[in-house]
Amino acid sequence: MKVCLVGSSGGHLTHLYMLKPFWQDQDRFWVTFPKPDAQSLLVDETMIPCYYPTNRSLKALLINTRLAWKVLRKERPDLIISTGAAVAVPFFYLGKLLGAKTMYIEIFDRIDSPTLTGKLVYPVTDRFIVQWEELKRVYPKAINLGSIF
C-alpha cells in the first residue's frame, strides 16, 4: 500500500510521525512545509515541499491545489492521512477524485471544537478520527480512538 502523509510542520507533523508503527512498513511519501523541523525529522524520508504560509490564504490554496494534482497523479497513493492543517484540503479532495482512501485525525488539542481543516475535509474523509469523545458531537461519523500520544 502506498501512503501519502500530508500536514503542516510542527505539531501536526509530530502527530503524523507518532503513527510510525503504522506507516514504517508502507511505501510512503510526505508532503509538508520545507522548514528546519520537518527537514530534520524526515531526513531519511521522501518529502515533497508544499507552499506556506497556508492560514486562510487563497494564494496558498491555489498553489497547493496545483501541487496536489501533480503529486497525486504521479504518486497514486492508496491512502492519504493527515492531522492538518490547510495543506491537507486539496490533497483530500483531489485524492478522492483519483480514488484514494482518506483518513483525517483531528489534532489532540481540539477537545470540543473543530478545526477549520477538519470541517473542510470531513465530507470527503473515509475515516475521521478524533481523540476526545466530546468531538463526536461535532463529527457524528467520527471514530474516537483516544490519544495517539
Predicted feature descriptions by range:
Residues 1-4:
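Extreme N-terminal starter segment of soluble prokaryotic enzymes
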Residues 14-21, 92-93:
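Histidine-anchored nucleotide/phosphate-binding helix
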Residues 56-78:
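An amphipathic, basic-hydrophobic alpha-helix
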Residues 20-25, 121-122:
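Short, conserved loop/helix-junction motifs that constitute active-site signature segments
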Residues 7-9, 25-64, 134, 145-148:
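Conserved nucleotide-sugar phosphate-binding/catalytic loop shared by glycosyltransferases and other
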Residues 79-98:
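An aromatic- and histidine-rich active-site surface loop
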Residues 100-149:
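Active-site-proximal region of nucleotide-activated glycan assembly enzymes
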